[in-house]
Amino acid sequence: MASKITFVFLVVVVINCAMMLSMPTAEAHNFLPCVITNDCEYHHCSSGTVLCVNRQCHCSRSSTHQTKLDNLKKMDYAKKCKWTKDCDPRMRFTCVSGSYMCFDGLCTCTN
């Protein structure tokens, strides 16, 4: 009886280890804090580019927007503003919701 329990326990441990080793190869979501994209320069992306989205560094995988992303990477999203119209309209490409506004004097993505 004890040998069956030990065998089942070992099988469970082996299965759990195999599942942990077979994690998908997609990048882990390490959300580093940022204010502008330049704050993410040390965040490694295996493919695509890194962007500051909603104050967190994210890896972008879209190759169709690569030119836009290269331009956006150089932009300063902490731009000071008085009105939403003062914000750079290209900012909508990096906002998850696609919208942004002037909040507390800074251009900020909205949820």
Swiss-Prot record:
Keywords: Antimicrobial, Disulfide bond, Fungicide, Plant defense, Secreted, Signal. The keyword Protein transport does not apply. Residues 1-28 form the signal peptide. It comes from the Eukaryota. GO terms for cellular component: extracellular region. It is found in: Secreted. One of its GO terms (biological process) is killing of cells of another organism. Disulfide bonds join C34-C52, C40-C57, C45-C59, C81-C102, C87-C107, C95-C109. The keyword Cell inner membrane does not apply. Belongs to the DEFL family. This is Defensin-like protein 295. It comes from Arabidopsis thaliana.
